[in-house]
């Protein structure tokens, strides 16, 4: 069993919007033999859309708004990629995805450097000590000086870096990269489809001068000497602890520098790591199966109103049609058609191992954070739901479609796209999100997937926080005094809806024994 687990590599690709994350995902799939032509992600002239952006709205907007899961084999390794939304409005989906991966590749735009979304996502990686590899993309366009970029990465992401490839110029002068890990030169040949052959040259021979010209060769030798003098030797142990990030340079769109990244990645990235539960730590090579649901997606197939629960296997082996224990429901379940994914293509899977992501058909059985085991009561930790930052009343715009609207809202909330609160004062439904774009996505999906129409009504709120107290009388007094501000979430928990920072601070001062939480573990 250990060899199956050892060959698993489960990771997420994260980035600020437009850094080239989806392009990189596609090129990795190209190398894995999963697609013949990459999706020419942005170009509308070529009417292809990125393989990993598979919801209609993603294809229209040219951005990823949900996490895609894809798996393929490469050089005896089993690769599971989670391509996450870069758009900040969908950060919560990304945060949850980071609980299901063993390592991360961060894509940084060579011209723009570190951007806000990258910083936030890196904080989540740091909290979990997730190993990180950095790919500096778009070197075939004008980019910042590589030394400046490395300084910025260290300062902004608070991590030691070590370049494993080094760029020779950028923009129209971009000649390629020198691979410090293998001591070879790879010359740049733009190619969107075919995987290019490497031109390999030893740096200390005249052949280098012949390939890129004597002035550039001299400059490259000087820069590489400086790199070795300034940056520590690459240390795999430090990388695995999340303390050092290897850096690669390239152009995902032109298929350049991606193979070096992939080859080094499968060699150094961790196989499945232990997972914490409230009861104990689960080791991946334990014989018994355990797993948790980190994501739910409605309508992978709009013809069948189906939901799929994405389950990360934490230990042991999963087998089709075997009874497993659903901890929250306290009952056993069998799964006759578990699936694995290549973006929209699903295949039924008979067995899967620790590190794999499987899709389980879901008709309302699962919530994010649910645990499956062979009988042990375990609760996996750390799948948070954050306090929303934007709020609107949701209203039915078509009285004939009340049932469809209710079902649509229910399934979309199960996905964790947004949060639903019922105002205790007037009984109205409030949707809370992290950003404006989510309201558009909800409205679009209700209309296109559920044939239901909604309207948004304005409501002025500052924060939603979950409240609890060890003193039931004080909690009751608080709820009476703040009646117009109280709501319930879908779990029936008490939520305080403050309309200003002042109201929140006064409530915290007046009620010392009430705990105000800004994240709820699902």
Locate the predicted segments by residue.
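Structural and coupling elements of P-loop NTPases
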Residues: 1-522
């Amino acid at each position: 069993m250990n060899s199956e687990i050892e060959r698993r590599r489960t990771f997420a690709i994260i980035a600020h919007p437009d850094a080239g994350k989806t392009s990189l995902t596609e090129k990795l799939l190209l190398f894995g033999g999963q697609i013949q032509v990459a999706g020419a992600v942005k170009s509308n002239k070529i009417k292809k859309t990125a393989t990993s952006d598979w919801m209609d709205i993603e294809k229209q907007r040219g951005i990823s708004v949900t996490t895609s899961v894809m798996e393929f084999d490469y050089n005896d390794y089993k690769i599971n990629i989670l391509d996450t939304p870069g758009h900040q409005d969908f950060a919560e989906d990304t945060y949850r995805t980071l609980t299901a991966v063993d390592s991360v590749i961060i894509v940084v735009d060579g011209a723009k450097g570190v951007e806000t979304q990258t910083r936030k996502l890196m904080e989540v990686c740091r909290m979990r000590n997730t190993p990180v590899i950095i790919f500096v993309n778009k070197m075939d366009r004008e980019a910042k000086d590589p030394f400046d970029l490395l300084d910025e990465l260290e300062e902004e992401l608070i991590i030691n870096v070590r370049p494993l490839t080094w760029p020779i110029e950028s923009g129209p002068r971009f000649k390629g990269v020198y691979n410090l890990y293998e001591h070879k030169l790879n010359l740049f040949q733009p190619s969107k489809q075919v995987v290019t052959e490497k031109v390999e040259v030893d740096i200390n021979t005249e052949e280098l001068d012949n390939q890129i010209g004597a002035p550039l060769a001299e400059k490259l030798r000087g820069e590489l000497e400086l790199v070795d003098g300034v940056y520590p030797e690459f240390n795999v142990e430090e990388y695995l602890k999340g303390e050092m990030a290897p850096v690669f340079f390239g152009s995902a769109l032109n298929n350049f520098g991606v193979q070096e990244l992939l080859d080094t990645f499968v060699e150094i990235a961790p196989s499945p790591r232990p997972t914490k539960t409230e009861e104990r730590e689960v080791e991946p090579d334990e014989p018994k199966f355990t797993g948790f649901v980190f994501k739910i997606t409605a309508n992978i197939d709009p013809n069948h109103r189906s939901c799929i629960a994405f389950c990360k296997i934490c230990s042991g082996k999963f087998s089709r049609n075997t009874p497993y224990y659903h901890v929250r429901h306290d009952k056993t379940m069998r799964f006759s058609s578990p699936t694995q994914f290549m973006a929209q293509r699903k295949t039924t899977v008979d067995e899967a191992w620790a590190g794999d992501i499987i899709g389980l058909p879901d008709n309302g059985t699962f919530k994010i954070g649910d645990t499956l085991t062979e009988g042990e009561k375990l609760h996996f930790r750390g799948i948070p739901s954050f306090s929303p930052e934007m709020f609107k009343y949701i209203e039915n715009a078509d009285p004939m479609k009340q049932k469809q609207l209710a079902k649509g809202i229910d399934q979309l909330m199960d996905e964790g796209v947004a949060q639903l609160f019922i105002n205790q004062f007037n009984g109205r439904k409030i949707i809370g999100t992290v950003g404006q774009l989510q309201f558009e996505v909800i409205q679009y999906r209700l209309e296109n997937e559920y044939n239901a129409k909604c309207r948004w009504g304005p409501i002025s709120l500052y924060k939603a926080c979950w409240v609890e107290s060890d003193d039931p009388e004080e909690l009751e007094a608080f709820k009476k005094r703040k009646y117009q501000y109280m709501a319930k979430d879908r779990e029936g928990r008490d939520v305080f809806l403050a309309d200003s920072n002042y109201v929140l601070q006064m409530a915290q001062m007046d009620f010392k024994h009430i705990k105000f939480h800004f994240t709820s573990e699902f």
